[in-house]
Amino acid sequence: MHATNMLSYTFKVNFLEIFGMTTYKAPLADIKFLLNDVLEMPSIAKLPGYEDATPDMIDAILNEADRFYSEVLAPTNMPADSQGSKLDGNNVITAPALKGVYKKIVDAGWSGLSGSTDFGGQGLPTLLSVAVDEMSHSANMAFSLCPMLTKGVVTALSLYGTKNQKEVYLDKLISGIWSGTMNLTEPQAGSDLSAIRTKAIPAGDHYLLSGQKIYITWGEHDFTDNIIHLVLARTPNAPEGVKGISLFVVPKFLVDDNGLLKERNDVCCVGIEHKLGIHASPTC
């Protein structure tokens, strides 16, 4: 029995030594082959609005993305997972290993790669952005879930937001100055969203929401000054089922029409889930 315990302990140590010290290197040859020869990036680059996406430009971006994510983000993967995120009152303190990484990504312009040029983005093909996101997720998936959710909010607002919502939120979301989340799941409503109970009551020119959401990826953190939540809720007298669900913009801090922050909203995080392999990602 003693020998078995020792062998088990030795295996665990060796496992951490081997896999904890692995480095990430993007399979650039494979990525470029898929983009150019399978998915026909050169043809996409000829479409209106993508004139800047020349082969040389695409190649340079992919090479720099490989360097950036392998040198800046990948080394944070193991320590950030060990450290995890911590809840302090209603505020989340992110893993120390990630301090400064988010700002480096924003400053380097990776957040707005395929964002609309009307709102400060670079307007490059989404296909290129997907390839770069693959590198980011491979380097540190827990961290990369944050910008991934933000892109989802950008897409939703771009397609369905009002003119005012686009003007107030999109430039800061595309640049990464603010982040975003999707709030769907509730304790009694997982895959069956028709069962959600969160209410949205009209109050003048806005709504007052009440309810509980769970499993919200990066629902609270200290990377950005504001977090823009997209929340599913029901208005009074809404029909039953999925047809009675509406989507609301709920910022962590209220925002005026000029995009300036006002007082903190009532939305808050009351707990953090512990998810295997992504402890650095605060799931609220």
Place the predicted regions along the sequence by residue.
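Amphipathic, small/basic residue-rich leader segments at the start of a protein or domain
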Residues: 11-145, 168
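Short hydrophobic alpha-helical segments enriched in small aliphatic residues
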Residues: 3-6, 10
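A short core secondary-structure module
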Residues: 206, 210-264
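Short Gly/Pro-enriched turn/cap motifs at secondary-structure boundaries
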Residues: 188-191, 220-222, 239, 275-282
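Flexible, small-/acidic-enriched active-site or ligand-binding loops
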Residues: 260-284
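Internal maturation/activation junctions in enzymes
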Residues: 149-150, 161-205
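Flexible, glycine/threonine-enriched loop-and-boundary segments that flank and lead into catalytic domains
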Residues: 88-103, 110-115, 181-203, 212-221
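Core alpha/beta catalytic barrel or barrel-like domain that forms the active/cofactor pocket
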Residues: 112-117, 139-155, 176-186, 246-247
